[in-house]
Curated annotation (Swiss-Prot):
Name of the gene this protein is made from: HA
Superkingdom to which the source organism belongs: Viruses
Subunit structure: Homotrimer of disulfide-linked HA1-HA2.
The protein's name in its UniProt record: Hemagglutinin
Molecular function per GO: host cell surface receptor binding
Predominant subcellular localization, coarse grouping: virion
InterPro entries: Capsid_hemagglutn, Hemagglutn_HA1_a/b_dom_sf, Hemagglutn_influenz_A, Hemagglutn_influenz_A/B
Function: Binds to sialic acid-containing receptors on the cell surface, bringing about the attachment of the virus particle to the cell. This attachment induces virion internalization of about two third of the virus particles through clathrin-dependent endocytosis and about one third through a clathrin- and caveolin-independent pathway. Plays a major role in the determination of host range restriction and virulence. Class I viral fusion protein. Binds to sialic acid-containing receptors on the cell surface, bringing about the attachment of the virus particle to the cell. This attachment induces virion internalization either through clathrin-dependent endocytosis or through clathrin- and caveolin-independent pathway. Plays a major role in the determination of host range restriction and virulence. Class I viral fusion protein. Responsible for penetration of the virus into the cell cytoplasm by mediating the fusion of the membrane of the endocytosed virus particle with the endosomal membrane.
Keywords: Clathrin- and caveolin-independent endocytosis of virus by host, Clathrin-mediated endocytosis of virus by host, Disulfide bond, Fusion of virus membrane with host endosomal membrane, Fusion of virus membrane with host membrane, Glycoprotein, Hemagglutinin, Host cell membrane, Host membrane, Host-virus interaction, Lipoprotein, Membrane, Palmitate, Signal, Transmembrane, Transmembrane helix, Viral attachment to host cell, Viral envelope protein, Viral penetration into host cytoplasm, Virion, Virus endocytosis by host, Virus entry into host cell
Site (Cleavage): 349-350
Modification note: Palmitoylated. In natural infection, inactive HA is matured into HA1 and HA2 outside the cell by one or more trypsin-like, arginine-specific endoprotease secreted by the bronchial epithelial cells. One identified protease that may be involved in this process is secreted in lungs by club cells.
Signal sequence segment: 1-18
Disulfide linkage: 22-486, 60-286, 72-84, 105-147, 290-314, 493-497
Protein backbone atom coordinates (compact mmCIF):
# COMPACT_ATOMS: atom_id res chain seq x y z
CA UNK A 1 0.00 0.00 0.00
CA UNK A 2 2.78 2.42 1.03
CA UNK A 3 4.71 1.51 -2.09
CA UNK A 4 1.70 2.40 -4.24
CA UNK A 5 1.35 5.78 -2.47
CA UNK A 6 5.03 6.55 -3.01
CA UNK A 7 4.87 5.64 -6.71
CA UNK A 8 1.75 7.81 -7.13
CA UNK A 9 3.47 10.77 -5.43
CA UNK A 10 6.59 10.45 -7.57
CA UNK A 11 4.45 10.14 -10.69
CA UNK A 12 2.42 13.23 -9.78
CA UNK A 13 5.48 15.37 -9.12
CA UNK A 14 7.23 14.25 -12.30
CA UNK A 15 4.20 14.80 -14.50
CA UNK A 16 2.61 17.82 -12.90
CA UNK A 17 5.09 19.76 -10.78
CA UNK A 18 7.76 19.76 -13.46
CA UNK A 19 6.17 22.76 -15.24
CA UNK A 20 6.42 26.11 -13.48
CA UNK A 21 6.45 29.79 -14.40
CA UNK A 22 7.80 32.54 -12.14
CA UNK A 23 7.76 36.33 -12.30
CA UNK A 24 10.69 38.55 -11.43
CA UNK A 25 12.44 41.78 -12.27
CA UNK A 26 15.80 43.11 -13.34
CA UNK A 27 18.53 43.38 -10.71
CA UNK A 28 22.15 44.47 -10.63
CA UNK A 29 25.00 43.38 -8.42
CA UNK A 30 25.59 46.92 -7.14
CA UNK A 31 22.59 49.23 -7.01
CA UNK A 32 22.33 52.93 -6.14
CA UNK A 33 20.97 54.11 -2.82
CA UNK A 34 18.22 56.74 -2.70
CA UNK A 35 16.05 58.28 0.00
CA UNK A 36 12.26 58.20 0.09
CA UNK A 37 9.69 59.79 2.37
CA UNK A 38 9.65 56.78 4.66
CA UNK A 39 13.12 55.29 4.40
CA UNK A 40 16.70 56.30 3.71
CA UNK A 41 19.23 54.31 1.73
CA UNK A 42 16.87 52.17 -0.37
CA UNK A 43 18.82 50.44 -3.12
CA UNK A 44 17.44 50.83 -6.64
CA UNK A 45 18.55 49.51 -10.02
CA UNK A 46 18.86 52.93 -11.68
CA UNK A 47 19.15 56.48 -10.37
CA UNK A 48 20.39 59.81 -11.66
CA UNK A 49 22.07 62.69 -9.89
CA UNK A 50 20.02 65.89 -9.58
CA UNK A 51 22.71 68.17 -8.12
CA UNK A 52 25.29 69.63 -10.50
CA UNK A 53 28.79 70.05 -9.08
CA UNK A 54 30.86 70.51 -12.24
CA UNK A 55 31.93 74.07 -13.00
CA UNK A 56 33.34 75.40 -16.28
CA UNK A 57 36.00 77.94 -15.15
CA UNK A 58 35.35 80.16 -18.19
CA UNK A 59 32.64 82.50 -19.40
CA UNK A 60 31.06 80.55 -22.26
CA UNK A 61 30.03 83.20 -24.78
CA UNK A 62 29.42 81.26 -27.99
CA UNK A 63 26.31 82.55 -29.77
CA UNK A 64 26.07 85.63 -27.56
CA UNK A 65 26.66 89.30 -28.21
CA UNK A 66 29.16 89.80 -25.41
CA UNK A 67 30.77 92.98 -24.13
CA UNK A 68 33.79 92.79 -21.83
CA UNK A 69 34.01 96.12 -20.00
CA UNK A 70 37.57 95.57 -18.83
CA UNK A 71 38.70 98.61 -16.81
CA UNK A 72 35.33 100.32 -17.25
CA UNK A 73 32.70 99.89 -14.56
CA UNK A 74 29.13 99.33 -15.70
CA UNK A 75 27.85 102.57 -14.15
CA UNK A 76 30.67 104.41 -15.86
CA UNK A 77 29.05 103.78 -19.24
CA UNK A 78 26.34 106.30 -18.27
CA UNK A 79 28.64 109.20 -17.26
CA UNK A 80 31.74 108.57 -19.36
CA UNK A 81 35.05 108.51 -17.45
CA UNK A 82 38.06 108.11 -19.77
CA UNK A 83 38.28 104.33 -19.24
CA UNK A 84 34.71 103.98 -20.57
CA UNK A 85 35.02 106.05 -23.75
CA UNK A 86 34.49 103.02 -26.02
CA UNK A 87 31.41 101.85 -24.09
CA UNK A 88 29.30 105.02 -24.01
CA UNK A 89 26.86 103.31 -26.37
CA UNK A 90 26.72 99.56 -26.86
CA UNK A 91 24.43 96.61 -27.47
CA UNK A 92 24.89 93.21 -25.78
CA UNK A 93 23.05 90.28 -24.27
CA UNK A 94 25.96 89.31 -22.01
CA UNK A 95 27.77 92.04 -20.06
CA UNK A 96 30.99 91.14 -18.26
CA UNK A 97 32.24 93.40 -15.47
CA UNK A 98 35.80 92.92 -14.26
CA UNK A 99 37.21 93.42 -10.78
CA UNK A 100 39.56 96.07 -12.17
CA UNK A 101 36.66 98.07 -13.61
CA UNK A 102 35.98 101.53 -12.18
CA UNK A 103 32.83 103.64 -12.56
CA UNK A 104 34.42 107.02 -11.87
CA UNK A 105 37.61 109.04 -12.27
CA UNK A 106 37.00 112.02 -9.96
CA UNK A 107 36.35 110.56 -6.47
CA UNK A 108 32.74 110.16 -5.40
CA UNK A 109 29.90 107.67 -5.50
CA UNK A 110 26.52 106.84 -7.01
CA UNK A 111 23.40 107.09 -4.92
CA UNK A 112 21.51 103.78 -4.77
CA UNK A 113 24.18 102.30 -7.00
CA UNK A 114 23.20 98.65 -6.70
CA UNK A 115 19.69 99.29 -7.97
CA UNK A 116 21.12 101.17 -10.93
CA UNK A 117 23.67 98.42 -11.54
CA UNK A 118 20.89 95.85 -11.53
CA UNK A 119 18.92 97.88 -14.09
CA UNK A 120 21.93 98.24 -16.38
CA UNK A 121 22.86 94.55 -16.16
CA UNK A 122 19.47 93.67 -17.58
CA UNK A 123 19.51 96.49 -20.10
CA UNK A 124 20.87 94.88 -23.26
CA UNK A 125 22.94 97.99 -23.86
CA UNK A 126 22.68 101.77 -23.91
CA UNK A 127 21.90 104.39 -26.49
CA UNK A 128 22.06 108.14 -25.86
CA UNK A 129 20.15 111.29 -26.80
CA UNK A 130 21.36 114.86 -26.43
CA UNK A 131 19.28 116.76 -23.88
CA UNK A 132 19.74 120.08 -25.71
CA UNK A 133 20.84 122.20 -22.74
CA UNK A 134 22.60 125.49 -23.55
CA UNK A 135 24.25 127.83 -21.07
CA UNK A 136 25.14 131.53 -20.95
CA UNK A 137 27.02 133.38 -18.24
CA UNK A 138 28.92 130.26 -17.08
CA UNK A 139 31.81 128.10 -18.24
CA UNK A 140 30.97 124.53 -19.33
CA UNK A 141 34.51 123.22 -19.69
CA UNK A 142 35.40 122.30 -16.13
CA UNK A 143 38.11 119.62 -16.06
CA UNK A 144 40.33 117.76 -13.62
CA UNK A 145 43.64 115.90 -13.61
CA UNK A 146 41.80 112.94 -12.08
CA UNK A 147 40.10 112.34 -15.44
CA UNK A 148 42.98 112.35 -17.89
CA UNK A 149 42.85 111.54 -21.54
CA UNK A 150 45.72 113.19 -23.40
CA UNK A 151 45.42 115.94 -20.78
CA UNK A 152 43.07 116.93 -17.97
CA UNK A 153 39.44 116.38 -18.92
CA UNK A 154 36.09 115.38 -17.42
CA UNK A 155 33.25 112.87 -17.72
CA UNK A 156 32.24 112.61 -21.38
CA UNK A 157 28.50 112.65 -20.65
CA UNK A 158 28.52 115.46 -18.06
CA UNK A 159 29.16 119.21 -17.97
CA UNK A 160 31.03 120.77 -15.06
CA UNK A 161 29.52 124.25 -14.85
CA UNK A 162 31.73 127.00 -13.36
CA UNK A 163 31.48 130.74 -12.86
CA UNK A 164 32.79 132.75 -15.78
CA UNK A 165 35.66 133.95 -13.63
CA UNK A 166 37.22 132.76 -10.40
CA UNK A 167 35.12 133.95 -7.45
CA UNK A 168 32.60 135.30 -9.96
CA UNK A 169 28.85 135.17 -9.42
CA UNK A 170 27.13 132.00 -10.56
CA UNK A 171 23.67 132.93 -11.93
CA UNK A 172 20.48 131.12 -10.93
CA UNK A 173 19.53 128.76 -13.77
CA UNK A 174 16.66 126.43 -14.67
CA UNK A 175 16.88 123.75 -17.35
CA UNK A 176 14.23 121.24 -18.44
CA UNK A 177 14.20 118.10 -20.55
CA UNK A 178 11.11 116.28 -21.85
CA UNK A 179 11.31 112.60 -22.72
CA UNK A 180 9.68 112.25 -26.13
CA UNK A 181 10.68 108.61 -26.55
CA UNK A 182 8.47 105.59 -25.94
CA UNK A 183 10.76 104.15 -23.29
CA UNK A 184 11.99 105.59 -19.97
CA UNK A 185 15.10 107.77 -20.01
CA UNK A 186 17.89 107.39 -17.47
CA UNK A 187 18.86 110.87 -16.24
CA UNK A 188 22.03 111.29 -14.14
CA UNK A 189 23.36 114.46 -12.51
CA UNK A 190 26.02 115.27 -9.95
CA UNK A 191 26.61 117.45 -6.89
CA UNK A 192 30.14 118.72 -6.34
CA UNK A 193 31.41 118.89 -2.75
CA UNK A 194 34.50 121.10 -2.85
CA UNK A 195 37.56 120.36 -0.75
CA UNK A 196 37.05 123.63 1.13
CA UNK A 197 34.71 126.60 1.36
CA UNK A 198 37.35 128.74 -0.32
CA UNK A 199 37.49 126.35 -3.26
CA UNK A 200 33.70 126.39 -3.59
CA UNK A 201 33.72 130.21 -3.62
CA UNK A 202 36.44 130.26 -6.25
CA UNK A 203 34.52 127.85 -8.50
CA UNK A 204 30.93 129.02 -7.97
CA UNK A 205 31.04 132.36 -6.19
CA UNK A 206 30.02 133.17 -2.65
CA UNK A 207 26.81 132.32 -0.87
CA UNK A 208 24.86 129.13 -0.21
CA UNK A 209 24.37 126.80 -3.11
CA UNK A 210 21.20 124.79 -3.74
CA UNK A 211 20.23 122.36 -6.49
CA UNK A 212 16.62 121.25 -6.89
CA UNK A 213 15.44 118.48 -9.23
CA UNK A 214 11.84 117.56 -9.92
CA UNK A 215 9.56 115.63 -12.26
CA UNK A 216 6.01 114.30 -11.94
CA UNK A 217 7.29 111.49 -9.68
CA UNK A 218 10.45 112.92 -8.18
CA UNK A 219 11.44 116.00 -6.15
CA UNK A 220 14.67 116.49 -4.24
CA UNK A 221 16.90 119.37 -3.19
CA UNK A 222 20.65 119.11 -2.64
CA UNK A 223 23.12 121.38 -0.88
CA UNK A 224 26.87 120.87 -1.37
CA UNK A 225 28.98 120.15 1.69
CA UNK A 226 32.46 121.63 1.23
CA UNK A 227 35.25 120.51 3.52
CA UNK A 228 38.57 118.67 3.73
CA UNK A 229 38.60 114.95 2.93
CA UNK A 230 41.32 112.38 2.29
CA UNK A 231 42.78 112.82 -1.16
CA UNK A 232 41.91 110.26 -3.84
CA UNK A 233 43.43 110.59 -7.29
CA UNK A 234 44.94 113.84 -6.05
CA UNK A 235 41.52 115.29 -5.17
CA UNK A 236 40.03 116.16 -1.78
CA UNK A 237 36.67 117.07 -3.30
CA UNK A 238 33.86 114.60 -4.12
CA UNK A 239 31.13 114.30 -6.73
CA UNK A 240 28.00 112.38 -5.76
CA UNK A 241 25.86 111.19 -8.65
CA UNK A 242 22.06 110.86 -8.49
CA UNK A 243 19.65 109.43 -11.02
CA UNK A 244 16.03 108.88 -11.95
CA UNK A 245 14.07 107.01 -14.62
CA UNK A 246 12.03 109.57 -16.55
CA UNK A 247 8.80 108.18 -18.00
CA UNK A 248 7.76 108.90 -21.61
CA UNK A 249 6.22 112.39 -22.02
CA UNK A 250 7.41 113.37 -18.55
CA UNK A 251 9.69 116.36 -17.93
CA UNK A 252 12.60 116.74 -15.53
CA UNK A 253 13.64 120.22 -14.37
CA UNK A 254 16.92 121.33 -12.76
CA UNK A 255 17.17 124.56 -10.79
CA UNK A 256 20.66 125.48 -9.50
CA UNK A 257 23.07 128.26 -8.61
CA UNK A 258 26.37 126.39 -8.60
CA UNK A 259 28.08 123.10 -7.59
CA UNK A 260 25.97 121.33 -10.23
CA UNK A 261 27.31 118.63 -12.57
CA UNK A 262 24.84 118.81 -15.45
CA UNK A 263 23.83 115.88 -17.68
CA UNK A 264 24.63 116.29 -21.36
CA UNK A 265 22.89 113.21 -22.81
CA UNK A 266 20.07 111.00 -21.57
CA UNK A 267 20.54 107.22 -21.64
CA UNK A 268 18.00 104.76 -23.05
CA UNK A 269 18.15 101.02 -22.41
CA UNK A 270 18.18 98.82 -25.50
CA UNK A 271 16.62 95.54 -24.42
CA UNK A 272 17.51 92.62 -22.16
CA UNK A 273 20.79 91.04 -21.15
CA UNK A 274 22.67 89.22 -18.42
CA UNK A 275 25.38 90.99 -16.46
CA UNK A 276 27.99 89.20 -14.40
CA UNK A 277 31.00 90.24 -12.36
CA UNK A 278 33.77 87.77 -13.09
CA UNK A 279 37.48 87.62 -13.83
CA UNK A 280 37.11 84.31 -15.68
CA UNK A 281 38.40 84.16 -19.23
CA UNK A 282 35.96 84.47 -22.13
CA UNK A 283 35.56 81.35 -24.28
CA UNK A 284 33.78 81.61 -27.63
CA UNK A 285 33.87 77.84 -28.14
CA UNK A 286 31.32 76.88 -25.49
CA UNK A 287 27.71 77.88 -24.88
CA UNK A 288 26.15 78.74 -21.55
CA UNK A 289 23.06 80.24 -19.95
CA UNK A 290 24.07 80.23 -16.27
CA UNK A 291 26.99 82.30 -15.01
CA UNK A 292 28.71 83.11 -11.74
CA UNK A 293 31.89 84.76 -10.58
CA UNK A 294 33.90 81.58 -11.15
CA UNK A 295 32.67 80.76 -14.66
CA UNK A 296 29.76 78.93 -16.26
CA UNK A 297 27.39 76.21 -15.10
CA UNK A 298 26.32 74.01 -18.00
CA UNK A 299 23.74 71.54 -16.75
CA UNK A 300 20.30 70.10 -17.38
CA UNK A 301 19.92 69.17 -13.71
CA UNK A 302 17.41 70.92 -11.45
CA UNK A 303 19.87 71.75 -8.66
CA UNK A 304 23.47 72.92 -8.27
CA UNK A 305 25.93 73.16 -5.40
CA UNK A 306 28.51 75.41 -7.10
CA UNK A 307 27.56 79.01 -6.34
CA UNK A 308 24.56 80.46 -4.53
CA UNK A 309 24.81 83.68 -6.56
CA UNK A 310 24.73 82.29 -10.07
CA UNK A 311 22.55 84.18 -12.54
CA UNK A 312 20.67 83.33 -15.72
CA UNK A 313 18.84 80.11 -16.52
CA UNK A 314 20.34 78.25 -13.60
CA UNK A 315 19.61 75.18 -11.52
CA UNK A 316 18.46 76.05 -8.02
CA UNK A 317 21.30 76.30 -5.52
CA UNK A 318 21.00 73.81 -2.65
CA UNK A 319 23.32 72.93 0.22
CA UNK A 320 23.28 69.21 -0.52
CA UNK A 321 26.08 67.91 -2.72
CA UNK A 322 24.02 64.95 -3.93
CA UNK A 323 20.33 64.11 -4.29
CA UNK A 324 19.78 60.87 -6.21
CA UNK A 325 16.54 60.53 -8.18
CA UNK A 326 15.35 56.95 -8.64
CA UNK A 327 14.71 56.04 -12.28
CA UNK A 328 14.43 52.31 -11.74
CA UNK A 329 12.90 49.80 -9.38
CA UNK A 330 14.01 48.59 -6.00
CA UNK A 331 17.07 46.39 -6.38
CA UNK A 332 17.29 42.86 -4.99
CA UNK A 333 20.84 41.88 -5.99
CA UNK A 334 21.86 38.28 -6.46
CA UNK A 335 24.73 38.49 -3.99
CA UNK A 336 26.62 35.45 -2.75
CA UNK A 337 24.17 34.81 0.09
CA UNK A 338 21.21 35.09 -2.26
CA UNK A 339 22.87 32.75 -4.75
CA UNK A 340 23.57 30.18 -2.04
CA UNK A 341 19.94 30.41 -0.95
CA UNK A 342 18.83 30.06 -4.56
CA UNK A 343 21.05 26.99 -4.97
CA UNK A 344 19.61 25.49 -1.78
CA UNK A 345 16.05 26.19 -2.90
CA UNK A 346 16.72 24.67 -6.29
CA UNK A 347 17.67 21.47 -4.55
CA UNK A 348 14.61 21.67 -2.39
CA UNK A 349 11.99 23.15 -4.70
CA UNK A 350 13.41 23.50 -8.17
CA UNK A 351 14.57 26.46 -10.22
CA UNK A 352 13.32 29.38 -8.14
CA UNK A 353 14.00 30.56 -4.60
CA UNK A 354 11.59 31.80 -1.97
CA UNK A 355 10.36 35.38 -1.68
CA UNK A 356 8.07 37.25 0.68
CA UNK A 357 5.62 40.13 0.28
CA UNK A 358 6.34 42.10 -2.89
CA UNK A 359 7.70 39.89 -5.65
CA UNK A 360 11.40 40.46 -5.04
CA UNK A 361 12.89 37.96 -7.48
CA UNK A 362 15.87 40.00 -8.66
CA UNK A 363 17.50 38.49 -11.75
CA UNK A 364 20.80 39.93 -12.90
CA UNK A 365 20.48 38.09 -16.20
CA UNK A 366 17.32 39.99 -17.16
CA UNK A 367 19.07 42.74 -19.12
CA UNK A 368 16.58 43.52 -21.90
CA UNK A 369 13.64 44.51 -19.71
CA UNK A 370 12.64 45.52 -16.22
CA UNK A 371 10.14 42.72 -15.67
CA UNK A 372 10.15 39.18 -16.93
CA UNK A 373 9.47 35.46 -16.61
CA UNK A 374 11.42 32.34 -15.86
CA UNK A 375 10.01 28.93 -16.58
CA UNK A 376 10.88 25.27 -16.44
CA UNK A 377 9.22 22.47 -18.35
CA UNK A 378 10.09 19.24 -20.10
CA UNK A 379 12.01 21.23 -22.74
CA UNK A 380 14.25 22.92 -20.19
CA UNK A 381 14.49 26.34 -18.58
CA UNK A 382 14.13 29.85 -20.02
CA UNK A 383 14.03 33.57 -19.23
CA UNK A 384 12.17 36.29 -21.14
CA UNK A 385 11.47 39.98 -20.56
CA UNK A 386 7.99 41.48 -20.55
CA UNK A 387 8.24 44.57 -22.74
CA UNK A 388 4.75 45.93 -22.16
CA UNK A 389 5.05 46.29 -18.38
CA UNK A 390 8.60 47.55 -18.78
CA UNK A 391 7.51 50.26 -21.22
CA UNK A 392 4.56 51.20 -19.03
CA UNK A 393 6.86 51.84 -16.08
CA UNK A 394 9.45 53.66 -18.19
CA UNK A 395 6.79 55.93 -19.71
CA UNK A 396 5.65 57.01 -16.27
CA UNK A 397 9.17 57.49 -14.93
CA UNK A 398 10.49 59.29 -18.02
CA UNK A 399 10.23 63.01 -17.56
CA UNK A 400 10.70 62.98 -13.79
CA UNK A 401 13.90 64.98 -14.15
CA UNK A 402 12.23 67.43 -16.54
CA UNK A 403 9.34 67.90 -14.13
CA UNK A 404 11.78 68.71 -11.35
CA UNK A 405 13.52 71.22 -13.60
CA UNK A 406 10.19 72.88 -14.43
CA UNK A 407 9.43 73.20 -10.73
CA UNK A 408 12.78 74.73 -9.87
CA UNK A 409 14.30 76.63 -12.79
CA UNK A 410 13.91 80.36 -13.09
CA UNK A 411 15.91 83.38 -14.20
CA UNK A 412 18.11 84.55 -11.36
CA UNK A 413 19.37 88.08 -10.88
CA UNK A 414 22.50 89.03 -9.00
CA UNK A 415 22.34 91.47 -6.11
CA UNK A 416 25.85 92.33 -4.94
CA UNK A 417 27.00 93.23 -1.48
CA UNK A 418 28.79 96.45 -2.44
CA UNK A 419 26.47 98.62 -0.37
CA UNK A 420 27.34 102.05 0.95
CA UNK A 421 26.83 102.90 4.61
CA UNK A 422 23.21 104.00 4.15
CA UNK A 423 22.40 100.78 2.29
CA UNK A 424 24.12 98.34 4.66
CA UNK A 425 20.92 97.52 6.54
CA UNK A 426 19.20 96.76 3.24
CA UNK A 427 22.21 94.64 2.29
CA UNK A 428 21.98 92.69 5.54
CA UNK A 429 18.29 92.04 4.93
CA UNK A 430 19.03 90.85 1.37
CA UNK A 431 21.80 88.54 2.60
CA UNK A 432 19.57 87.14 5.34
CA UNK A 433 16.76 86.64 2.84
CA UNK A 434 19.11 84.89 0.40
CA UNK A 435 20.34 82.54 3.15
CA UNK A 436 16.75 81.82 4.18
CA UNK A 437 15.77 81.06 0.58
CA UNK A 438 18.72 78.65 0.28
CA UNK A 439 17.60 76.88 3.47
CA UNK A 440 14.03 76.60 2.19
CA UNK A 441 15.04 75.36 -1.24
CA UNK A 442 17.52 72.87 0.19
CA UNK A 443 14.66 71.39 2.20
CA UNK A 444 12.28 71.60 -0.77
CA UNK A 445 14.78 69.87 -3.04
CA UNK A 446 15.25 66.99 -0.62
CA UNK A 447 11.49 66.69 -0.19
CA UNK A 448 10.72 66.82 -3.93
CA UNK A 449 13.30 64.13 -4.72
CA UNK A 450 12.07 61.94 -1.85
CA UNK A 451 8.47 62.24 -3.10
CA UNK A 452 9.48 61.29 -6.64
CA UNK A 453 11.56 58.36 -5.35
CA UNK A 454 8.64 57.10 -3.27
CA UNK A 455 6.39 57.33 -6.32
CA UNK A 456 8.91 55.50 -8.52
CA UNK A 457 9.30 52.58 -6.12
CA UNK A 458 5.54 52.34 -5.55
CA UNK A 459 4.99 52.53 -9.31
CA UNK A 460 7.45 49.75 -10.14
CA UNK A 461 5.96 47.59 -7.38
CA UNK A 462 2.53 48.24 -8.87
CA UNK A 463 3.63 47.21 -12.37
CA UNK A 464 5.10 44.00 -10.95
CA UNK A 465 1.84 43.21 -9.20
CA UNK A 466 -0.16 44.00 -12.37
CA UNK A 467 1.95 41.51 -14.28
CA UNK A 468 1.45 38.89 -11.58
CA UNK A 469 -2.32 39.42 -11.63
CA UNK A 470 -2.36 39.12 -15.42
CA UNK A 471 -0.76 35.67 -15.21
CA UNK A 472 -2.98 34.57 -12.33
CA UNK A 473 -6.17 35.54 -14.20
CA UNK A 474 -5.05 33.58 -17.25
CA UNK A 475 -4.10 30.35 -15.48
CA UNK A 476 -7.10 30.26 -13.10
CA UNK A 477 -7.59 26.75 -11.71
CA UNK A 478 -4.99 25.30 -14.11
CA UNK A 479 -2.20 26.34 -11.74
CA UNK A 480 -1.53 27.00 -8.10
CA UNK A 481 0.36 29.91 -6.54
CA UNK A 482 3.21 28.83 -4.33
CA UNK A 483 3.38 32.15 -2.46
CA UNK A 484 6.83 32.87 -3.84
CA UNK A 485 6.00 34.63 -7.10
CA UNK A 486 5.63 31.35 -8.97
CA UNK A 487 2.79 29.26 -10.41
CA UNK A 488 2.92 25.46 -10.45
CA UNK A 489 1.06 24.40 -13.60
CA UNK A 490 -1.12 21.26 -13.45
CA UNK A 491 -0.61 20.29 -17.07
CA UNK A 492 2.25 19.86 -19.44
CA UNK A 493 3.18 23.35 -20.72
CA UNK A 494 5.74 23.40 -23.53
CA UNK A 495 7.59 26.50 -24.75
CA UNK A 496 4.66 27.58 -26.95
CA UNK A 497 2.37 27.28 -23.97
CA UNK A 498 4.76 29.34 -21.84
CA UNK A 499 4.93 31.95 -24.61
CA UNK A 500 1.13 32.19 -24.69
CA UNK A 501 1.13 32.95 -20.95
CA UNK A 502 3.67 35.70 -21.47
CA UNK A 503 1.77 37.10 -24.47
CA UNK A 504 -1.59 37.03 -22.67
CA UNK A 505 -3.03 34.58 -25.24
CA UNK A 506 -3.16 31.52 -22.97
CA UNK A 507 -6.40 29.48 -23.37
CA UNK A 508 -7.12 27.89 -20.00
CA UNK A 509 -10.03 25.87 -21.42
CA UNK A 510 -7.66 24.02 -23.71
CA UNK A 511 -5.76 22.56 -20.75
CA UNK A 512 -8.56 22.48 -18.21
CA UNK A 513 -9.36 18.75 -18.38
CA UNK A 514 -5.73 17.69 -18.01
CA UNK A 515 -5.19 20.15 -15.21
CA UNK A 516 -8.24 18.93 -13.26
CA UNK A 517 -7.15 15.30 -13.58
CA UNK A 518 -3.65 16.08 -12.37
CA UNK A 519 -5.00 18.22 -9.52
CA UNK A 520 -7.19 15.24 -8.39
CA UNK A 521 -4.15 12.96 -8.44
CA UNK A 522 -2.22 15.41 -6.31
CA UNK A 523 -5.15 15.70 -3.89
CA UNK A 524 -5.23 11.88 -3.69
CA UNK A 525 -1.57 11.85 -2.75
CA UNK A 526 -2.28 14.36 0.00
CA UNK A 527 -5.31 12.34 1.19
CA UNK A 528 -3.38 9.02 1.26
CA UNK A 529 -0.64 10.70 3.19
CA UNK A 530 -3.27 11.79 5.73
CA UNK A 531 -4.60 8.21 6.19
CA UNK A 532 -1.06 6.98 6.69
CA UNK A 533 -0.60 9.39 9.56
CA UNK A 534 -3.84 8.19 11.22
CA UNK A 535 -2.75 4.53 10.95
CA UNK A 536 0.61 5.34 12.51
CA UNK A 537 -1.04 7.06 15.48
CA UNK A 538 -3.53 4.15 15.88
CA UNK A 539 -0.72 1.58 15.84
CA UNK A 540 1.18 3.52 18.47
CA UNK A 541 -1.91 3.65 20.74
CA UNK A 542 -2.67 -0.08 20.31
CA UNK A 543 0.93 -0.99 21.15
CA UNK A 544 0.79 1.05 24.34
CA UNK A 545 -2.51 -0.62 25.36
CA UNK A 546 -1.14 -4.14 24.70
CA UNK A 547 2.00 -3.44 26.72
CA UNK A 548 -0.10 -2.19 29.65
CA UNK A 549 -2.41 -5.29 29.53
CA UNK A 550 0.57 -7.72 29.58
CA UNK A 551 2.10 -5.88 32.52
CA UNK A 552 -1.15 -6.14 34.51
CA UNK A 553 -1.52 -9.92 33.79
CA UNK A 554 2.05 -10.61 34.96
CA UNK A 555 1.46 -8.63 38.14
CA UNK A 556 -1.77 -10.57 38.89
CA UNK A 557 -0.02 -13.98 38.48
CA UNK A 558 2.86 -12.95 40.74
CA UNK A 559 0.50 -11.79 43.49
CA UNK A 560 -1.54 -15.03 43.26
CA UNK A 561 1.56 -17.25 43.65
CA UNK A 562 2.86 -15.20 46.55
CA UNK A 563 5.84 -13.91 44.60
CA UNK A 564 4.58 -10.36 44.94
CA UNK A 565 2.85 -8.71 47.84
CA UNK A 566 0.91 -5.50 47.80
CA UNK A 567 0.56 -3.66 51.14
CA UNK A 568 -1.80 -0.74 51.52
CA UNK A 569 -1.21 1.52 54.54
CA UNK A 570 -3.77 3.98 55.83
Amino acid sequence: MNTQILILAISAFLCVRADKICLGHHAVSNGIKVDTLTEKGIEVVNATETVEQKNIPKICSKGKQTIDLGQCGLLGTTIGPPQCDQFLEFSANLIIERREGDDICYPGKFDNEETLRKILRKSGGIKKENMGFTYTGVRTNGETSACRRSRSSFYAEMKWLLSNTDNGVFPQMTKSYKNTKREPALIIWGIHHSGSTAEQTRLYGSGNKLITVWSSKYQQSFAPNPGPRPQINGQSGRIDFYWLMLDPNDTVTFSFNGAFIAPDRASFLRGKSLGIQSDAQLDNNCEGECYHIGGTIISNLPFQNINSRAIGKCPRYVKQKSLMLATGMKNVPENSTHKQLTHHMRKKRGLFGAIAGFIENGWEGLIDGWYGYRHQNAQGEGTAADYKSTQSAINQITGKLNRLIEKTNQQFELIDNEFNEIEKQIGNVINWTRDSIIEVWSYNAEFLVAVENQHTIDLTDSEMNKLYEKVRRQLRENAEEDGNGCFEIFHQCDNDCMASIRNNTYDHKKYRKEAIQNRIQIDAVKLSSGYKDIILWFSFGASCFLFLAIAMVLAFICIKNGNMRCTICI
